[in-house]
């Protein structure tokens, strides 16, 4: 029997000052922009008209442009945005295979996917990557 990966989403209220709150909001906005840019590119697809769903191909097609357009959003956050877009595009591609006519993914939610490189946990606080370095949150 193989190893099963289990993922959980933890919703955590962060205690931050006003400056850190502003940086987090700007980070959320740029993360959303990054995900949308990747989704737009993947939706436009290949010359054969297929939706691009490969994370590697989407990375190659969009990474530099997304980093530039988002004023050098943290690299791990750019990759997380790409993964979010790739998952949404894969869902659309599956729906097309099933004969449905899905609409292009549109990202509006105020959330960011942090991996272990973009967030560091300590006993009493955590540090999170933002558009202007890292902030501390309790």
Model-derived features with residue positions:
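Nucleic-acid substrate recognition interfaces
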Residues: 1-138
């Amino acid at each position: 029997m193989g190893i099963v990966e289990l993922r959980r989403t933890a919703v955590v209220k962060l205690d931050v000052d006003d400056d850190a709150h502003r940086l987090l909001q700007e980070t959320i906005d740029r993360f959303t922009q990054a995900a949308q840019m990747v989704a737009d590119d993947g939706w436009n697809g290949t010359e054969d008209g297929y939706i691009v769903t490969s994370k590697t191909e989407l990375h190659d097609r969009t990474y530099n442009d997304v980093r530039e357009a988002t004023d050098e959003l943290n690299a791990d956050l750019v990759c997380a945005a790409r993964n979010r877009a790739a998952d949404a595009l894969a869902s659309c591609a599956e729906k097309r295979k099933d004969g449905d006519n899905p609409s292009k993914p549109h990202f509006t939610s105020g959330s960011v996917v942090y991996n272990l490189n973009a967030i560091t946990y300590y006993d009493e606080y955590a540090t999170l990557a933002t558009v202007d370095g890292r902030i501390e949150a309790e």
